[in-house]
């Protein structure tokens, strides 16, 4: 069964490309193992929130910024690997 990864991003801010970039990178890292969905907010929220199996792992609103560095990406990878290991 695929692991749920949900990204809520600011649609009004034009963050869809950042979401699609992250989605592709995660799909390349975990081919066929993730169910990734994104939701763009219609109003300007500044959101770029990433949840793995319902748990908030990355939050731009809480100061994490975008997933724009290798260390931020590896934090997501570690959370996904842990969730997959729990099955």
From Swiss-Prot:
Q: Which GO terms describe its biological process?
A: erythrocyte differentiation; response to lipopolysaccharide; response to selenium ion; response to stress
Segments passing through the bilayer? none
Q: What is the lineage of its organism?
A: Eukaryota, Metazoa, Chordata, Craniata, Vertebrata
Q: Which cysteines are joined by disulfide bonds?
A: none
Q: Say if the entry is tagged with keyword Cytoplasm.
A: yes
Record-level Gene Ontology MF annotations? antioxidant activity
Q: Which UniProt keywords apply?
A: Antioxidant, Cytoplasm, Glutathionylation, Redox-active center, Selenocysteine
Residues where S-glutathionyl cysteine occurs? 37
- Record's subunit section: Interacts with DPYSL2, PRDX1, YWHAB, YWHAG, HSP70 and HSP90.
Q: Which Gene3D superfamilies match?
A: Glutaredoxin
Would the keyword Ligase be found if you checked this record's keyword annotation? no
Please give the function described in this protein's UniProt entry.
Answer: Plays a role as a glutathione (GSH)-dependent antioxidant. May be involved in a redox-related process. May play a role in the myopathies of selenium deficiency.
Compartments (UniProt record)? Cytoplasm
Q: What is its main location?
A: cytoplasm
Pfam families xref list: Rdx
Query: Which NCBIfam families would you find in this protein's record?
Result: CXXU_selWTH
* Similarity section: Belongs to the SelWTH family. Selenoprotein W subfamily.
Its protein name is Selenoprotein W
Would you name any one GO CC term?
cytosol
Q: Where is this cross-link: Cysteinyl-selenocysteine (Cys-Sec)?
A: 10-13
What does the record say about tissue specificity? Ubiquitously expressed with highest levels in skeletal muscle and heart, moderate levels in brain, spinal cord, thyroid, spleen, prostate, ovary, small intestine and colon, and lowest levels in liver and lymph node.
